[in-house]
Regions:
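Non-catalytic alpha/beta scaffold blocks inside enzyme catalytic domains
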Residues: 1, 9-184
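Short, solvent-exposed turn/loop segments enriched in Gly/Ser/Thr/Pro and often Arg
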Residues: 4
Length: 184
């Protein structure tokens, strides 16, 4: 905008570079669903998914989406309402049971997204579980893990996300495949 890109002390407005040399996630296995689209287009996929194509909506794995989203599982994100423009339009979409039939939110706070959920599953807070914290998004080339032992016991009925998903896998008959013999 001010023609300063590339001059000393300036940049493009993007965040500084970072490299993610440590992958702290669990293996994901093979996903039988091959079709995907950018997450921030989920409202369009709820209302009119069939109009979303590889050319106009970056659909991958197919030329277009074949059906509207009817079920949303939102984990620790609060992305249903506060990460998008047009909050009033999103509210109407989320409140219409004919559009999204079921919304599940997993979080440790009653976020704006959780207020639209049919089911809220209580997650733990970082201080209640042993964790390995990985590289943050803005620390440059310093790849590391920090051991974070729990500082407090889990209160009430919260469960770590791994345990929530283990229970779901158990109910679908794939618990052993999900856990691969591991426990949390």
């Amino acid at each position: 905008v001010v023609r300063q890109v590339g001059l000393p002390g300036t940049n493009t407005g993007a965040r500084e570079g970072d490299s993610y040399g440590i992958d702290t996630g669990l293996p994901t296995g093979k996903n039988p669903v091959k079709v995907s689209f950018p997450i921030f287009l989920w409202p369009k996929a709820v209302i009119d998914a069939k109009s979303m194509t590889s050319k106009n909506a970056a659909v991958r794995g197919a030329d277009h989406l074949s059906h509207n989203i009817k079920f949303i599982w939102n984990t620790q994100g609060n992305t249903l309402i506060n990460q998008h423009g047009g909050i009033n339009q999103l509210r109407k979409i989320l409140e219409d049971d004919k559009l999204v039939e079921t919304i599940v939110v997993v979080d440790n706070q009653m976020t704006p997204s959780a207020k639209f959920a049919d089911y809220v599953l209580p997650d733990t807070m970082n201080q209640e579980i042993d964790e390995l914290e990985g590289d943050a998004y803005a620390v440059g080339d310093y790849n590391y893990l920090i051991a974070c032992p729990k500082a407090a016991d889990i209160l009430w009925d919260q469960r770590p996300n791994f345990e929530i998903m283990r229970e779901m896998a158990k109910r679908f008959g794939v618990e052993d495949k999900y856990t691969e013999g591991r426990t949390y």
